[in-house]
């Protein structure tokens, strides 16, 4: 028995929207009997791409989070459905029967991820099917995965130890998008944005000369990290937990250590950190 899933690496996603566009191309105006009815022209995003703005000037960032149906093993939509209108295939894919689901708007309301949509014209709920019709025809992956130019989406069988997705799931730190929902989602993520701290180091005097190659260490929240400033004296630490207090130490030979403490109520820009000669 298989458990098909997608592993989404947020670190790789560049927001090209190929996944969204290829999904629309596959489903808009196209019926796949027993699998799905055609998407309407407006209002449905079976593969959403969320743009997350992070940080503050002059250290802003943008992250992109692709978001399909999570194909949950404890799917609230299945509990809300009547007459078997939502079911799980033997390969783990959660499907909505377009005929049995007619009139069942409760299926839409049951999804905590908000990835099930109501087709007003046809009066049915609709969502991502992981291109089950393609898989059953012998294709190896959904359209969204096939069209990703940076390999941010990896599809495969989680129960096949030889599959790429199984190997990556073991070697990387994967997580659910919203673990507090307790839905045991098959779709997993790498690199969901947390908080980050950034700053720039300069030497006192010399008109604020950049300080490249300077050691910067960070402790707190169970972390003990170290980096060096780049050619412009900039540094950054990613993956910091919310509402944690951290200590940052900047040290360079011949200069006094500079210590900063901060709490991650949000992303932090420490600005210019000046190193004084000893």
Regions found by a protein language model. Give the residues of each.
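Iron-sulfur cluster-binding cysteine motifs and their immediate structural context
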Residues: 18-36, 74-100, 106-123, 140-161
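Long, compositionally biased charged/polar accessory segments in the mid-to-C-terminal portions
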Residues: 144-196
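Short, ordered, surface-exposed loop/turn motifs in non-cytosolic proteins
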Residues: 195-197, 204-221
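Short Pro-Gly-centered beta-turn/loop motif in secreted/extracellular proteins
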Residues: 211, 236-247, 253
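A short, solvent-exposed loop/turn motif at the edges and junctions
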Residues: 249-261
